[in-house]
Amino acid sequence: MERMKLTTETAIDIDFKNGEIAGVLYKGKQLNDGSAPMFSVKLRKKTGESRIVSAKECTFVAFENNIAFYTSECFDLKLLVKEKDGALVWKADIKNKTQDLLEWVELMSFTVTGKLQDEPQGQGSIIYPYNEGCRVTNMAYRESMPFRYIEPDYPSKNTFSIFPNMISAQFIAYLLDGVGIYLGMHDSERTTKHVDFCYYDDKIKVFMRAFCDVDYGEDYSMPFDSVFKVFEGDWYQAADIYYHWFSANKPQGLQKIVENVNIPKWYSQSPLVVVYPLRGKHDTDTTPNGLYPYKNALPLLEDIAQKTEGNVMALLMHWEGTAPWAPPYVWPPFGGEEEFSSFVDEAHSKEILVGLYCSGMGWTNRSQVLKEYPDGDDFERLEINEIVCENSNGEVKSTICLAQRDGFDLCPAMERTKRILQTELNKLCASNIDYVQALDQNHGGCSYFCYSDKHGHTPAPGKWQQIETNKLLSGIQTNGVLLGCESAAAEPFLKQLQFSDNRFELNYYIGTPIPLYAYLFHEYVNNFMGNQICAMLEKRENNFTYRLAYSFAAGDMLTVVMNGDGDFQYAWCDYTPPNDKLVNKKSALEFIKTLNTWRRFGGKEFLHYGKMIAPIGVKCSQERFLLEDGKTYFVADAVVCAAYEFADRKAQFIVNYNFYPVEIELEKVCDVYFDSALSHCEKSKKTFTVAPLSVIMVEF
């Protein structure tokens, strides 16, 4: 057993012989519980078969000069474990003894008690950078839901816990009683990673895996630091560790919004995004809904703009001239270019922006929405099989959007893929619109798994995915049109995907959404609230206003989903009963007006340009929302809070999303602003009332 002393208060006990982290100690208190192999390696054959070899299956040789030596029948491994700046830095060098491919290496794995804090006899929580950020407090609940733990493999699922897809940053943390364990892979090349947690016997294992970027039979040498650190605080302090590294290792060319002269003017005007289908009522429906012809929506959009006293963006679904959600060919638009162009021109004359959903790196063999599309077999004729993502054994299969289409995922390493997608997206960007959600269904912006040995990339997931995707995006002639993806853009794509369709609401299936993404990246990119698909909070009057408040506080632009009557749905593809219940449109518009007025005026420097910081404490009552399973409650404070820093000023926004006043108490005295013009200020306040559906700002 080796005791690695990190600080005067922190020590890590590592049992190198048994290959496990035995103890994580802070001020004498043990933070972990039990143990798991502290490293594992996955090897893959060309047939697609694989095996995982863990530290438990390796023979320990020696630990000398901060390097542990292991051997096995498949590989020899040198593991650097060294104290640096109050943390343990880990690196693995692997000598491959086989002709198999080293697919990934898992490092620094540790276990905690098998129940989290919201379970009987549970403790602790997991900070998880999934879909803009999540605090997980009930492991059994997570495992009972659609976003449970899944071992990633081919073919990709769009729920995989993969960076840079649903996972936006390269770390994860465990919190217990104000102390945390941070795992981070500080990789400036941003290779593909699996960042996750799962049951391990009767415990929970927290781990990170890096894909190795090597070919069959090749060795692997980790080119970055894997960091294990104990810290005091909450999720903000875990994020601070990562933010410190990120700030010194940003993606090339990434600029803060305040410095970025290439962002269009409308970005700073915070338009309300109005999502609606040109036809149909949900993903797989195309029946007339009253919103076609295109211009039918203009009076509804004008009314929304007038009542919110701000800009709006019409973000269209089901506009494709081929079939809804049937990539890659979508142009010309439904009804023809002339009619669409006339709509865009008239919308712009009324200061209404126009955006389009587009379906990313996919190929449609047969639409399930319009079964007559396509009318030929282009897959065979064009030899598309040569450019689709495939398994090691040549199998081709896709699990993405099967209700909408039968098809495949395209591999961005192939020049034909780039050429097809660039050609199609160029047509959209030349149509005088303002925004394209270019990579809907490619969550976070990245491609899906491909193991082909014929595409010119290493025959497994790896850094080539983000490199080739960025090349694809760079080749689009945007003409000033902003691009985005589904879920917030992951770290490698921040420069090119600057306005994306957030998916924080998916985290209700896992735990509690937290604005982790905004805390890390808000200075560089503002997104929008998103179409809220699968937002499964019970339909109470403060359901939608809560989600508006959450997005506002996270620094994002707001969204409504409009139906053919001009009413607002709780979410796109809304299936939460009662299905016919709609948002109170009048109160929603009034609240949006209040929020956007703050965002465009008194709070603009913070909410548009600022760096999110840890907020000061606020005491208030709580609200409870019943979740989809009919027995679990999501508990939220009666006000939503977020704090920002800009130009040496710090401000916190406190939002009451309820239809009743809320009494609050600040942890310290502050100056309080009650209006977005900053004309009504009360000095040195600590307790006060926040009016229904209102915002206050405190400076501290």
Give the label of every model feature segment:
Residues 4-313, 346, 350-353, 435, ...:
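Carbohydrate-recognition beta-sandwich/jelly-roll modules
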Residues 209, 219-224, 425, 462-681, ...:
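Active-site-proximal substrate-binding groove within the catalytic cores of carbohydrate-active enzymes
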Residues 272-295, 323-338, 401-420, 452-466, ...:
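The substrate-binding groove and active-site-proximal loops of carbohydrate-active enzymes
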Residues 274, 312-316, 354-357, 436-438, ...:
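Hydrophobic faces of well-ordered beta-strands that scaffold small-molecule active sites
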Residues 289-305, 417-429, 544:
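Short, acidic/polar
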Residues 294, 339, 345, 353-428, ...:
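Active-site-adjacent "subsite" loops/lids of carbohydrate-active enzymes
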Residues 320-321, 358-364, 442-443, 487-491:
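Active-site-proximal loop/turn and secondary-structure-junction residues that shape catalytic pockets
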Residues 409-495:
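Active-site neighborhood of glycoside hydrolase catalytic domains
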